């Protein structure tokens, strides 16, 4: 399983997603791509004395962040280099099997519908 993770989404980002992803990669051997501000992700590693990412992990740089106050309908147009939009585009392009974000739910559903698209025969996006 190849997971693309929005490292900048959520209240405790990027620390919580980055540390959680590292633990998952170590425990389960999951391939994970952290998407976000590369320097901030590296700062989390330095702060916790982590010299190298586990095997199968990589960082994909995205300079912008979707804020909880951003208009979900406009995020796709206005923040094309956000961690959420870049991650969804990676998923749509086949770079991963799943995309995870603790960021704006509205922006995630809108982005998933517009970028990744729905499965044929499915009319509404699902959350789980």
What are these regions (language model features)?
Residues 1-114:
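Contiguous, glycine/small-aliphatic-enriched amphipathic segments in soluble metabolic enzymes
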Residues 110-128:
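Short, acidic/small-residue loops that bind anionic groups at enzyme active sites
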């Amino acid at each position: 399983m190849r997971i693309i993770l929005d490292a900048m989404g959520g209240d405790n980002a990027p620390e919580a997603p980055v540390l959680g992803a590292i633990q998952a990669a170590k425990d389960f051997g999951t391939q994970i791509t952290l998407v976000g501000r590369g320097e901030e992700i590296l700062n989390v590693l330095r702060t916790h004395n982590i010299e190298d990412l586990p095997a199968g992990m990589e960082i994909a740089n995205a300079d912008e962040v979707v804020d909880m106050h951003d208009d979900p309908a406009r995020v796709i147009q206005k923040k094309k280099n956000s961690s959420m939009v870049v991650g969804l585009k990676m998923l749509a392009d086949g770079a991963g099997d799943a995309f995870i974000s603790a960021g704006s739910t509205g922006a995630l559903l809108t982005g998933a519908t517009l970028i990744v698209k729905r499965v044929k025969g499915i009319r509404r996006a699902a959350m789980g």
